[in-house]
């Protein structure tokens, strides 16, 4: 089965070097952040649209994956085994990688087999929600365009299909 692990980030996390200092000031910094980490993943995957990947067991131990395990990656066109967690040079900011490393054992306690050593981490997915939020008032109407009711993921108010549906219902009401 496939699953995603989401690490929340805020505008103060948008610096491209992965540091958290609150220096983000441009509304498009979120887009720049996405592009930076997607480009890094492209490079780590070898530049041919293969995704960077690593076995969960190796990721937790801080070891490099050299061969696939019993769980084969489902991503097409394929996965290149690499070190997703090189300090300062990994596929995500160090704090995000640390959060994933901490969360995996907790997931395992709730879902047996979730973090089995041969499971494959494939990354990155940077688009769980819009990096921009279209501002809206208490009535859910856009503050800038009368008659526009921004809702869901594309408007920056949801991070998945369920929360987008809930937001859409709230806006419609």
Language model: regions and residue ranges:
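An anion/pyrophosphate-binding glycine-rich loop and adjacent beta-alpha core
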Residues: 1-86
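Generic low-polarity alpha-helical segments
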Residues: 5, 44, 134-136, 150, ...
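Short helix/loop capping segments that flank catalytic or ligand/cofactor-binding pockets
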Residues: 13-17, 143-145, 158-161
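Glycine-rich, flexible loop/turn motifs
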Residues: 52, 56, 130, 139, ...
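A glycine-rich dinucleotide-binding beta-alpha-beta segment and adjacent secondary-structure elements
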Residues: 83-152, 165
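A conserved FAD-binding loop/helix module that cradles the flavin
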Residues: 152-173
């Amino acid at each position: 089965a496939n699953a995603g692990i989401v690490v929340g980030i805020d505008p103060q996390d948008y610096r491209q070097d992965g540091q958290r200092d609150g220096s983000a000031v441009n509304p498009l910094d979120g887009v720049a952040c996405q592009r930076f980490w997607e480009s890094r993943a492209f490079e780590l995957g070898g530049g041919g649209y293969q995704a960077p990947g690593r076995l969960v067991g190796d990721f937790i131990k801080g070891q490099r994956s050299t061969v696939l395990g019993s769980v084969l990656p489902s991503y097409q066109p394929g996965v290149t085994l690499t070190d997703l967690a090189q300090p300062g040079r990994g596929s995500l900011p160090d704090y995000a990688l640390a959060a994933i490393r901490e969360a995996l054992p907790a997931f395992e306690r709730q879902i047996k087999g979730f973090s089995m050593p041969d499971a494959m981490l494939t990354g990155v997915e940077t688009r769980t929600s819009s990096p921009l939020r279209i501002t809206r008032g208490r009535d859910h109407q856009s503050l800038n365009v009368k008659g526009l009711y921004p809702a869901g993921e594309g408007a920056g108010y949801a991070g998945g299909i369920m929360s987008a549906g809930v937001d859409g219902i709230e806006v419609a009401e």
